[in-house]
Amino acid sequence: MFKKVLFILSLCPSFAVAQSYVVYDFTHNRVLESHAPDSVQPIASVTKLMTANVFLENNTNPNCTIAITSDDRDYIKGTSTKLPMNVPMACRELLKAMLVHSDNYAAHALSRAAGMSRIQFINKMNEKARQLGMYSTRFHDSSGLSSSNISSPMDLVKLAKHSLNKPEIRQLSNISATNIQAGRHSVLMKNTNKLVRDEIFDAVVNKTGYIRESGYNLVFINKHPCKSSTIGVISLNNSSSAYRSSFTKNKLEKYGCTALNGRTIHDVEGEAQYEDGYDEEGLNDLIKKVSG
């Protein structure tokens, strides 16, 4: 029976073997600390930072609306959405759902809202990466569900720096919780980053990411100057969401950033539903069934 479990696990794609990160001073454009900064790894939903940039730069209708349809379903990992299907929504609400709660369906719908096919939108994402000098970066979908979406911490520094120029990204990065308006529906969504969700740090750029192949990722730039410098922490393949939060907090504090009102990280019961990543209970149930 144990061999059957091992066989099932062998079918699951593996993820990168080591954490890589950069602590970056965005005021003086210099690396403060790093480990394997050019290591290329899957980035998961960190992808959505590029999706947001490409949408904002190519959408010509600031009042656009679009409905989530079956075309926006996740056929890679099987994730779901809290948002209603076939209900026209303001694009700004979809952008909010994507950046605050990392909603995959919203990411797919936004690529259509920009007046392009999904393939055309992804081509724009790769074109933008080349323009920014992100030569180790490749995109295959707009949500980050594909493990073929790859980048490095140093490439993501360039994306983070570019994102600083977008007022919409700056605002949405720091929302701890929000109600998404979809027709008559109002859907509560919380930030996937515990540091923002629990108001431990304010963010000016903030995007988490997780799939099994990537580990837990984060692009984070602190909103408030740290000893007169704007400091960011970009890390890939953290071992857990909790470790990602503590690692980022420790690095920020090491370089002069202070937690809001001296707040610390505490576990909160039931908050797992607000974390990024997809539901792996199906795999766990299958393993239990085979091994039982």
Per-segment meaning from a language model:
Residues 19-20, 24, 92, 116-291:
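Penicillin-recognizing serine hydrolase domain
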Residues 16-154, 158-167:
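Active-site-adjacent loops and short helices of periplasmic peptidoglycan-processing enzymes
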Residues 2-13:
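Sec-dependent N-terminal signal peptides
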Residues 9-11, 51-55, 181-182, 191-193:
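Intrinsically disordered, low-complexity boundary segments flanking structured domains
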Residues 7-8, 52, 284-285, 292:
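Short amphipathic alpha-helical "recognition" segments used for binding
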